[in-house]
Amino acid sequence: MATLSTHPNYGFHLGQAQGLEDYAPQSQLQLSPGMDMDIKRVLHYSQSLAAMGGSPNGPAGQGVNGSSGMGHHMSSHMTPHHMHQAVSAQQTLSPNSSIGSAGSLGSQSSLGSNGSGLNSSSGHQSAGMHSLATSPGQEGHIKRPMNAFMVWSRLQRRQIAKDNPKMHNSEISKRLGAEWKLLAESEKRPFIDEAKRLRALHMKEHPDYKYRPRRKPKNPLTAGPQGGLQMQAGGMGQQKLGAGPGAGAGGYNPFHQLPPYFAPSHHLDQGYPVPYFGGFDPLALSKLHQSQAAAAAAVNNQGQQQGQAPPQLPPTSLSSFYSGIYSGISAPSLYAAHSANAAGLYPSSSTSSPGSSPGTITPNGMDGSMDSALRRPVPVLY
């Protein structure tokens, strides 16, 4: 190693080579004119040794021959740029410098490979962006021609966005709309003419164009479940109150003015349900009236025998009647009036108990007992 460092053909010693930076990039490595001459001298010496085939005696000569052969091989297969790096590696022959040259070569090769990878990846990205840019046109979507406001706002929007980069797009649109409304007709005229020209050009390019707006599908839940329920309930109410097979023959319904089942209130237009009164059917009322008349006749018969006791109706009939009526709403005056009408519907259907005589009961007495029975307060569970 000492002989190589003091060889007469080498223009500098190892001490000079130790001052160079390890792993230095090629752009930062600057060669002096003296070092360039030394490199040329080493190349000439190595080529002459390779041509002669001889080598100096001793281990040092073998090392120089091996290094010269390697230098000749590298010089024949590498570019001058890489040759300078290989020659600098032969000249220094120190561990740090040799590692530095190898590291520089490795780093350069790795950079070259990475650079090719970056170039290929950038090429793929550019191709992908190009395909994305051309994809809307491939779908065949034709844009609508711009109107006068769009022609005017296209330039104004750019200017506002340039002056206020932090302003949101919605705020810019609001400002543009307000400014467009404040413009005079004479100021709008150039943009209106431009919009007409663009429309005529669009019709010429696309004669078969027809604007087809893409309507958003309506959610069935937004229509409101109450709406469908009210329509269905309205039909049911009409069927309940409609003319049946025996309605026109002689059946009179005194409760035709009641609201239908689940009918919405008209003053509030809200779908609060109103319950249907099943106790107001004519058949049920006739049975109730017969039971009340029989109970009243029995009470009157007992009152005549026991000194006119206060008439009392069986609680079962009244409880069944009012339990059927007061299902979800309280209107005592309405039901009292209907009960009175129901009592007046059947004036001749008075029946007496089996043990009473037919001549002891008068219609006036029965009416008085019915009035007293209907005027009594009845406890109602709300």
Swiss-Prot record:
DNA-binding span(s) = 142-210
Tissue distribution is: Initially expressed in a pair-rule-like pattern which is rapidly replaced by strong neuroectoderm expression.
User: Which UniProt keyword terms apply here?
Assistant: Developmental protein, DNA-binding, Nucleus
A molecular function annotated in GO for this UniProt entry is: mRNA 3'-UTR binding
**Subcellular location field:** Nucleus
Gene3D superfamilies, alphabetically? Answer: High mobility group box domain
**Which InterPro entries does this entry report, sorted A to Z?**
HMG_box_dom (IPR009071), HMG_box_dom_sf (IPR036910), SRY-related_HMG-box_TF-like (IPR050140)
Name the residue ranges with Low complexity bias: 96-123, 347-360
Pfam families, per the entry: HMG_box (PF00505)
Q: Does the keyword DNA-binding apply?
A: yes
- GO-annotated cellular components: cytoplasm; nucleus
> Where does this protein have compositionally biased stretches of type Gly residues?
60-69
Report the SMART domains cross-referenced here: HMG
Phenotype seen when the gene is deleted: Flies exhibit severe segmentation defects, including loss and/or fusion of abdominal denticle belts and stripe-specific defects in pair-rule and segment polarity gene expression. Mutant embryos also exhibit loss of specific neurons, fusion of adjacent ventral nerve cord ganglia and aberrant axon scaffold organization.
Q: Name one GO biological process term.
A: regulation of DNA-templated transcription
Q: Where is this region: Disordered?
A: 53-142, 346-382
Give the principal location in a single coarse category. Answer: nucleus
Functional note: Essential for segmentation and CNS development. May modulate the actions of other transcription factors, including gap and pair-rule proteins.
Protein name according to UniProt? SOX domain-containing protein dichaete
The species this protein belongs to is: Drosophila melanogaster (Fruit fly)
The root-end lineage is: Eukaryota, Metazoa, Ecdysozoa, Arthropoda, Hexapoda
Q: Which gene holds the coding sequence for this protein?
A: D
